[in-house]
Structure formats: structure tokens, C-alpha cells
């Protein structure tokens, strides 16, 4: 797991052909906008969150974000414990995101 600045996260993501963007916010938060092409799994679903992660391809690189960077950091730690080796946390989260936004 690595905490990446907004610039590092966006730069790595743009060059990564093996990337999956993971949004761990709630449905209500996602309705306010999201990073394009992201997959949403709400971390507050507890075991449901873990169950969904278990279905994901561990060989991919995961770029994980939430509103401020706290939940996504927790999500990256959970992912590491489940055997995901490449989970990157977006420092500052969506509220500091300056890239493209979808609604």
C-alpha cells in the first residue's frame, strides 16, 4: 500500500494499463460526483465490502479513494491483508481531486 499525492496518483493512473479505480464512498456521496470509470464498493458495508473485494482480480493495480483519504487508507490496508499487493490511496480524497469528475 502507498499513500500518493493527488499528482502522483493521477500521473500513475494515466500511465497504468492494469489499473482499476476503486471508490469506497457511500451511494449518497457517489451521487455528488465521482472519478470517471471508477468501481464503487462502500467500505461501510463491512463484511459485504470484504466479500466484494474477494471477487476482484488481485493482479490489478487499485487506485482507491474516498471523500478525504481516511476510509480509502483503511480500504488499502484491508486489501493488503487480503493479498492485494498494489493498492494506492489518494491523499486528500475526492474533496481535493482536481481531475475529471462524472455525475
Predicted features, each with a name:
Residues 1-20, 27-61, 67-103:
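Rhodanese-like catalytic fold shared by cysteine-dependent sulfurtransferases
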